[in-house]
From Swiss-Prot:
GO terms for biological process: ribosome disassembly. It comes from Brucella melitensis biotype 2 (strain ATCC 23457). Keywords: Cytoplasm, Elongation factor, GTP-binding, Nucleotide-binding, Protein biosynthesis. GTP binds at residues 17-24, 86-90, 140-143. This is Elongation factor G. It is found in: Cytoplasm. GO terms for cellular component: cytoplasm.
């Protein structure tokens, strides 16, 4: 079977937004207008197509990014293939967003016309900047009370630091919003609100003619800056044609020089079709973005993989999901080459082979079996054994490791216990499955209490995982109170000279090490050997490193993992008969325990970046409350009629904050929080923690 659509006619994009900007409704409309959905699912009644896990439907927020393939006929009459990746908008799921942005070529940022740029919009926008993803902006909910298109455009500049390029203006607002002015064609597009109805094209309303002229002029001025020849022609008085203008906007968008801005209301079916045309006209095909970089496994040098069917096969696994009918599904983006069912591929990250059994094309929650797929495709693979998120699968003869994704460490932990003996076994399976799907979720067991501890990015994150355990795996569990993931570190250098000697019939054990332990700025552990003259033979040195690493998981104060330690082995002594790797391991273990005490061990706690958006009446209460939680206020700013309070607050003092904020502001204030850094715990608090955990 040959390729059906040319790679130039692909658009791999996602929709990114704040929690309530209407992303699910927008995705639904896109699926409806592109002909894949016959009945529109409304988020309000929990029947939406993309949000296919039960909790997403109940909570009305999108958690799992599902990939959907659909098609759209552009203005030029040519059909394009859209692969849409749904991304979550809640801060506890930023890992999902990061992961989907990694495999997109472009994105639509959705704004709520009333709220404009919200905290989570900024977070997601920053993540998209990191991967240099071309973006358009759609100002949604233009029918809402307080909708203000021009303020939203201004906020794209002031809050996101991005260059906004309106290509449409709204006709009317709130209840009177009827359509848009197309600034390229200089026509008015209006809709009567009937579902699926095309726009009526007419003349621009007389009272908007001047404004439209002014904005078109700004549009042209920004667009011609992208191209020298166009700029020269413009300065000499030659205006670009509409097609030339579209080509310039496309070039600038793909180069992330500016962001086209459109508007409408997905819920009332106004403005959706022009947005789909804009996806075709302004967002990149896989061949328009730089080729993906990777490391050639054989030569260990940097290499690239072009978006072409002729190039060696390479693909990136970006999501693992458990499908009730198919079992484990691995979603992967094919960057280069052609994939055929039944082939064996190399997982270069794990160094294992994987056989491709069943291959599926997903449409939100229905699926179609396929036998082959090509560069640019996003496919779901059933039954992979070794592959986890972020792994590369490729042609075994041309092995490559594509860029790795980096995932943050979890900041919150809870103890979890199965309710019955029967739940015990099921819980282990469920937790392993969930951890394979989500790299920001960790499972470990507490050696002393024997309890199972789960760790994640926030309270909502863990709530949802416990909920999934109950629903998908039928595991009933008791959940403890959330615990902070404290860490320990050292404050000064200490030199330790330690000898391990054991003599008990036959050969004994002997090792002497002299190690300097000192703090360093990073969070990782650094080991260095400065042994000269063979006082510790080369083959024993890894034992020294291993010994230290084995005890760094439990610091001397309260048994928390240690961060930011550098150990330098400077001297030692060995015995021809009694020394071994194990003896040096034991010696360095004891040396570290002694060193951590002498080097001024201290407790560290996670500090969260908190942003509260509140009506002005409650600002005093919000600030007072954050101060009482050991928070440091870093500033306040006006946002429309609301005030934004920014603060750094220890995570330990933020549990249950959502309820306090709700009652303090009569439900009118909102907040977002994300991990920022670790900081030493004040002495009085540290003593309490040590008492509790020692």
């Amino acid at each position: 079977m040959a390729r059906e659509y040319k790679i130039e006619d692909y658009r791999n994009f996602g929709i990114m937004a704040h929690i309530d900007a209407g992303k699910t409704t927008m995705t639904e409309r896109i699926l409806f207008y592109t002909g894949k959905n016959h009945k529109i699912g409304e988020t309000h009644d929990g029947a939406s197509t993309m949000d296919w896990m039960e909790q997403e439907q109940e909570r009305g927020i999108t958690i799992t990014s599902a990939a959907t393939t659909t098609f759209w006929q552009g203005r030029d009459g040519k059909k394009r293939r859209f692969n849409i990746i749904d991304t979550p908008g809640h801060v506890d799921f930023t890992i999902e967003v990061e992961r989907s942005l990694r495999v997109l070529d472009g994105a639509i940022a959705l704004l709520d016309a009333n709220a404009g740029v919200e905290p989570q919009t900024e977070t997601v926008w920053r993540q998209a900047e990191k991967y240099h993803v071309p973006r358009m902006v759609f100002v949604n909910k233009m029918d809402k009370i307080g909708a203000d298109f021009y303020r939203s455009v201004e906020m794209v500049g002031s809050r996101l630091g991005a260059v906004a390029l309106p290509v449409q203006l709204p006709i009317g607002a709130e209840n009177d919003f009827v359509g848009v002015v197309d600034l390229i064609e200089m026509k008015a597009l209006t809709w009567d609100g009937t579902i699926g109805a095309p726009a009526t094209v007419g003349e621009i309303p007389a009272d908007m003619a001047d404004k439209a002229e002014e904005y078109r002029e700004k549009l042209i001025e920004l667009a011609v800056e992208i191209d020298e020849a166009a700029m020269e022609a413009y300065l000499e008085g030659t205006m670009p044609t509409n097609d030339e203008l579209r080509a310039l906007i496309r070039k600038g968008t793909i180069e992330v020089k500016f962001h086209p801005i459109l508007c409408g209301t997905a819920f009332k079916n106004r403005g959706v079709q022009p947005l789909l045309d804009a996806v075709v006209e302004f967002l990149p095909a896989p061949t328009d973005v730089p080729a993906i970089k990777g490391i050639d496994v054989k030569t260990e040098t940097e290499t690239t993989r072009e978006s072409s069917d002729e190039a060696p096969l390479s693909m990136l696994a970006f999501k693992i999901m458990n499908d009730p009918f198919v079992g484990s599904l691995t979603f992967a983006r094919i960057y280069s080459g052609k994939l055929t069912k039944g082939v064996s591929l190399e997982n270069t990250v794990k160094g294992k082979r994987e056989r491709i059994g069943r291959m599926l094309q997903m449409h939100s929650n229905s699926r179609e079996d396929i036998d082959e797929a090509f560069a640019g495709d996003i496919v779901a693979l059933a039954g992979l054994k070794e592959t986890t998120t972020g792994d590369t699968l490729c042609d075994p003869l041309k092995p490559v490791i594509l860029e790795r994704m980096e995932f943050p460490d979890p900041v919150i932990e809870i103890a979890i216990e199965p309710k019955t003996k029967a739940d015990q076994e099921k819980m282990g399976i469920a937790l392993n499955r969930l951890a394979a799907e989500d790299p920001s979720f960790r499972v470990k067991s507490d050696e002393e209490s024997g309890q199972t501890i789960i760790a994640g990015m926030g309270e909502l994150h863990l709530d949802i995982l416990v909920d999934r355990m109950k629903r998908e795996f039928k595991v009933e569990a008791n959940v403890g109170a959330p615990q902070v993931a404290y860490r320990e570190s050292i404050t000064r250098a200490a030199e330790i000279d330690y000898t391990h000697k054991k003599q008990s019939g036959g050969s004994g054990q002997f090792a002497r090490v002299k190690i300097i332990f000192e703090p360093h700025d990073g969070d990782d552990f650094i080991f260095e050997s400065k042994i000269v003259g063979g006082s510790v033979p080369k083959e024993y040195i890894p034992g020294v490193q291993k010994g230290i690493e084995s005890v760094m998981g439990a610091g001397p104060l309260a048994g928390f993992p240690m961060l930011g330690v550098k150990a330098t082995l400077i001297d030692g002594t060995y015995h021809d008969v009694d020394s071994s790797v194990l003896a040096f391991e034991i010696a360095s273990r004891a040396a570290f325990r002694e060193g951590a005490q002498k080097a001024g061990a201290q407790l560290l706690e996670p500090i969260m970046k908190v942003e509260v958006v509140t009506p002005e009446d409650y600002v005093g209460d919000v600030i007072g409350d954050l101060n009482s939680r050991r928070g440091q206020i870093s500033g306040t700013e006006a946002r429309g009629i609301a005030t934004v309070v920014n603060a750094m607050v220890p995570l330990a003092n933020m549990f249950g904050y959502v309820n306090s904020l709700r009652s303090m502001s009569q439900g009118r204030a909102q907040y977002t929080m994300q991990f920022d850094h670790y900081e030493p715990v004040p002495t009085a608090v540290a003593q309490e923690i040590q008492k509790k955990f020692a």
